[in-house]
A protein has these predicted regions:
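C-terminal catalytic histidine-bearing segment of alpha/beta-hydrolase fold enzymes
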Residues: 50, 61, 227-276
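Short substrate-entry loop that stabilizes the transition state in hydrolases
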Residues: 65-70, 75-117, 155, 167-168, ...
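Short alpha-helix in the alpha/beta-hydrolase fold that links the catalytic acid
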Residues: 216-225
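N-terminal cap/lid segment of alpha/beta-hydrolase-fold proteins
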Residues: 27-67
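Short beta-strand/loop motif that positions the catalytic acidic residue
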Residues: 205-208
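Glycine/proline-rich low-complexity segments that form flexible loops, beta-turns, and polyproline
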Residues: 271-411
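Catalytic nucleophile-loop/oxyanion-hole region of alpha/beta-hydrolase
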Residues: 85-87, 92, 107-139, 249-255
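Primarily recognizes the serine-hydrolase "nucleophile elbow" in alpha/beta-hydrolase
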Residues: 125-201
Length: 411
């Protein structure tokens, strides 16, 4: 039998590529999952047997001590309540969270046909209570425990949140004394029906794809209900991607969702135990109120503290006040301060739209006669109080601080 030399050469090249190519999630030794921790060591209520499927449990993934933020997340894999995508939407997610300083606990909840959805919800509630009862052991904070779910796991997280309750202080079981409420929630490509209100619905991060139309519609509806109830929420609907994308590794667009989630968790101040400071003040540029811009506090001594920005929309006041919106502001610590000057003139029209002279005290930020013309004159970023300063503008914010004023010079 003859062998084509070209085919042989190509086969050798292909073999070389296969040998040299790195394996995603590969390790020097086979992966050994952690031993599941039973949520009811003496048997779950309503258990119909004695197999693993009858024993709700969590698998524990703790971050290294030097990365631990004290934040924790119960991970609920999807699977239509008939199976669980434990690796794809469980272990891989938990490892990602652990690498970012967040303790992760993959939930083995009960599924059909032996059990009902209500049993899975009971397992999710028990997981929240179990973590609070063992917070010292796992080095997590009892008021920074959330839940992330995918597909059916997303529905489970919603159902658990909507039906959560306070603990029973007189219960014999220390776990039953704990609250089952979620401090925050992350929902991936799943939807749920439920009565949204500020008591039972925690701050929530949503992500889905437009291709996964049915689930995207349900998530938009839930987000809208939360928005109407003034509950903090953030939603991302990516254009491409079918149902069940997991981390979406390798997708340059959809694969951004884990970092967006982390940014949201950080912005919610869920990665520190420090309370926010209700800070406000004034900003001056060259001795005058800053016409229009922003002030940003960037943490220097705590890499997981939330960076915060307040906007100065000085369209109807002679002073350049800044204050933070829904959240009071930064947490105590050292910060680098950035002040942005966006434009000399706030208005884009070149005449008084009300056909009257503009009162001087209402347009103190306008430096030209009348309403002025459109301009981007002198758009600056100030990182120092004065251009000749050797060091950046920094401050230390302490607990109890309420007002902090700033003045920068352009020359």
């Amino acid at each position: 039998m003859s062998i084509n030399k070209t085919s042989l050469a190509l086969a050798c090249v292909a073999l070389t590529v296969l040998i040299a190519a790195p394996r995603i999630f590969a390790a020097d030794t086979p992966y050994v999952p952690p031993t599941p921790v039973l949520l009811w060591p003496d048997g779950a209520p309503g258990a119909t047997g004695n197999s693993e499927e009858d024993k709700p449990a969590i698998s524990v993934y703790l971050p290294d001590a030097d990365k631990n933020t004290g934040c924790a997340i119960v991970v609920c894999p999807g699977g239509g309540f008939t199976h669980r995508a434990t690796d794809y939407e469980g272990v891989i997610i938990a490892e990602w969270l652990r690498s970012h300083g967040i303790a992760a606990f993959v939930l083995r909840y009960r599924i059909h046909p032996l059990y009902k959805n209500s049993d899975a919800v009971a397992d999710a509630h028990r997981a929240m209570q179990f973590l609070r009862a063992h917070a010292d052991e796992y080095k997590i904070s009892t008021d920074r425990i959330g839940m992330i779910g995918f597909s059916a796991g997303s529905e489970l997280a919603c159902l658990a949140a909507f039906s959560a309750a306070d603990g029973k202080p007189d219960a014999t079981d220390i776990i039953d004394r704990q609250s089952s409420r979620l401090n925050f929630m992350v929902l991936g490509y799943g939807s749920s029906q439920g009565q949204v209100n500020r008591t039972n619905t925690p701050p929530t991060f949503f992500f889905c794809t437009a291709e996964d139309r049915g689930h995207a519609t349900g998530m938009i509806d839930l987000f809208t209900a939360m928005y109407d109830a003034n509950i903090p929420a953030e939603i991302h609907i990516f254009p491409n991607g079918e149902h069940g994308v997991g981390l979406a590794n390798g997708d340059a667009v959809l694969g951004m969702w884990p970092q967006l989630m982390y940014n949201w968790i950080r912005a919610q101040n869920l990665l520190t135990a420090s309370p926010r400071v209700n800070l406000s003040g004034h900003v001056k540029l060259d001795g005058q109120p800053l016409p229009h811009g922003s002030i940003t506090f960037i943490p220097l001594d705590n890499p997981v503290a939330p960076p915060v920005t307040a906007y100065i929309m000085n369209s109807d006041t002679p002073t350049a006040d800044y204050k933070f919106g829904r959240d009071p502001g930064p947490i105590p610590g050292k910060y680098r301060v950035e002040i942005r000057h966006d434009a000399m003139v706030w208005m884009s029209n070149n005449r008084d739209p009300f056909n009257r002279a503009a009162p001087a005290d209402r347009i103190a930020h306008i430096r030209s006669p009348g309403w002025g013309a459109p301009t981007i004159d002198k758009v600056y970023l100030f990182t120092k109080a004065h251009p000749s300063d050797a060091n950046d503008l920094t401050v230390e914010i302490k607990p109890g601080d309420k007002e902090m004023n700033f003045e920068v010079s352009s020359k």
